[in-house]
Amino acid sequence: MDILTLGWVSVLTLFTYSIAMVVWGRHGM
C-alpha cells in the first residue's frame, strides 16, 4: 500500500465517521 492509497483511506474513513456522527446526532442517540 502506497502513501496515496493510505491517504485516501484515511480521508474516506474520517468523512464516513463525520457523516455517521451527524446522522446519529440528528436521531438523538
Curated annotation (Swiss-Prot):
InterPro entries: Cytochr_b6-f_cplx_su8_sf, Cytochrome_b6-f_cplx_su8. GO terms for biological process: cytochrome complex assembly; photosynthesis. Pfam families: PetN (PF03742). It is a single-pass membrane protein. One of its GO terms (cellular component) is cytochrome b6f complex. It comes from the Bacteria. Its main location: membrane. The chain crosses the membrane at residues 3-23. GO terms for molecular function: electron transporter, transferring electrons within cytochrome b6/f complex of photosystem II activity. Keywords: Electron transport, Membrane, Photosynthesis, Thylakoid, Transmembrane, Transmembrane helix, Transport. It is found in: Cellular thylakoid membrane. The 4 large subunits of the cytochrome b6-f complex are cytochrome b6, subunit IV (17 kDa polypeptide, PetD), cytochrome f and the Rieske protein, while the 4 small subunits are PetG, PetL, PetM and PetN. The complex functions as a dimer. Component of the cytochrome b6-f complex, which mediates electron transfer between photosystem II (PSII) and photosystem I (PSI), cyclic electron flow around PSI, and state transitions. Belongs to the PetN family. This is Cytochrome b6-f complex subunit 8. It comes from Acaryochloris marina (strain MBIC 11017).
